Amino acid sequence: MKHLTPREIVAELDRHIVGQNAAKRAVAIALRNRWRRKQAPENLRGEITPKNILMIGPTGVGKTEVSRRLARLANAPFLKVEATKFTEVGYVGRDVEQIVRDLVEAAVGMIREQKRAGVDKAARDKAEERLLDALVGAEAQSSTREVFRRKLRAGELDDKEVDLDFADTNNPMQMLDLPGQGGSMSMINLGDMLGKAMGGRTRRVRTTVREAAKPLVTEEADKLVDEEQIVREAIMAVEEDGIVFLDEIDKIAARKDRGGADVSREGVQRDLLPLIEGTTVSTKRGAVKTDHILFIASGAFHVAKPSDLLPELQGRLPIRVELEPLTRDDLRRILVEPQASLIRQYEALMAAENVTLTFEDGAIDRIADMAEAVNKSIENIGARRLQTILERLLDDISFDAPDKGGETFTITASYVDEKVGSLAGNADLSKFIL
């Protein structure tokens, strides 16, 4: 993990997300506290637990994006899940421990990619030798191999077909799901058992040199890395640096004025308590402790209130951050300021067709005005409204772009009014189109 200060973390988040400084500060401090804990004396380290966060704010204001960018910044195992997908233990469906199992699998994939990158050169060399064996035979003279090696590296043989043996990873009995468990018993993996019992099976594939190159490098890299070490490091990464973003937490808050049992509400909250507090979860990779996993819960809380959550769950989410609804100025900044702003994305998409797309300042102002107006009059979906309006605005240009190579399109305020103005002004049409 990079040892960034909270100020540096906020500055990095500012490159991608507009506003929401309170949320950025909260996650920046939480991330820095991980590094601080690792510097603490050994006898204190186990006692310092992460201060989990509850983000409160309407949809489309940046709750998910803050967490996603934070995970990329920390290079940490990250999982985003909706709280509504889980049911109480004992009922048909996924139980909350599946969160940890999925997080471990995400970490294994992340660590494996890092290990593959470390042996990339050796894997490429071995893949090249296998391709040469397929092209000229393993018994060919070294001079012949060198001639073909030069041609291979120059790309002259890319379209030539070769027969290669690849490890057979397909298994019709890959996973045993027990009835009613919703895949949560994934530690019982028949594919692993049968694969070890039958040894490494291979299958012969006829393919071109170009198409074979990448899977060959991946296969050779997997032979060079230690799978057990990957699993050990993945479990450690989850236990020390894992981040879980628990969205729609407000949807499992049981409101006081509603009676009756509801398996997807209070029961799920009770199941979440030990997970967030710290417990040990069995996975097919081994036991995983959740004591130091950072949980970031979020919800709009339009109907329910944070106080409708179980008191014990509220206590396990001590940091409360309220995200502000987006203003017209925020919407305008979202269009132009982030490193991968929506305007830049659409310009890049059109550039692929050799079409130059430019937006006048007046057009950007009109788009922001319309987004704010529709959000206020119909349903506030935050920054996502900008995408809806831009798609509608650029519909004709996107459709005709392949036939307009070399041309330049300038989006003006009048063009925005012409394409979207009538829809934005008509509340009934906006409900269905914008």
From Swiss-Prot:
Classification via InterPro entries: AAA+_ATPase (IPR003593), ATP-dep_Clp_protease_ClpX (IPR050052), ATPase_AAA_core (IPR003959), Clp_ATPase_C (IPR019489), HslU (IPR004491), P-loop_NTPase (IPR027417)
Any one GO CC term of the record: HslUV protease complex
MF-aspect GO terms: ATP binding; ATP hydrolysis activity; peptidase activity; proteasome-activating activity
Gene Ontology BP terms: protein unfolding; proteolysis involved in protein catabolic process
Keyword Repeat: no
Domain of life: Bacteria
Keywords carried by this UniProt record: ATP-binding, Chaperone, Cytoplasm, Nucleotide-binding, Stress response
Subcellular location per the Swiss-Prot or TrEMBL entry: Cytoplasm
Gene3D superfamilies: 1.10.8.60, P-loop containing nucleotide triphosphate hydrolases (3.40.50.300)
Residues involved in ATP binding: V18, G60, V61, G62, K63, T64, E65, D247, E312, R384
Keyword presence, Cytoplasm: yes
SUPFAM superfamilies cross-referenced by the UniProt entry: P-loop containing nucleoside triphosphate hydrolases
Function: ATPase subunit of a proteasome-like degradation complex; this subunit has chaperone activity. The binding of ATP and its subsequent hydrolysis by HslU are essential for unfolding of protein substrates subsequently hydrolyzed by HslV. HslU recognizes the N-terminal part of its protein substrates and unfolds these before they are guided to HslV for hydrolysis.
Family statement drawn from the similarity comment of this UniProt entry: Belongs to the ClpX chaperone family. HslU subfamily.
Subunit structure: A double ring-shaped homohexamer of HslV is capped on each side by a ring-shaped HslU homohexamer. The assembly of the HslU/HslV complex is dependent on binding of ATP.
Protein name, entry field: ATP-dependent protease ATPase subunit HslU
Record lineage: Bacteria, Pseudomonadati, Pseudomonadota, Alphaproteobacteria, Hyphomonadales
Gene of this entry: hslU
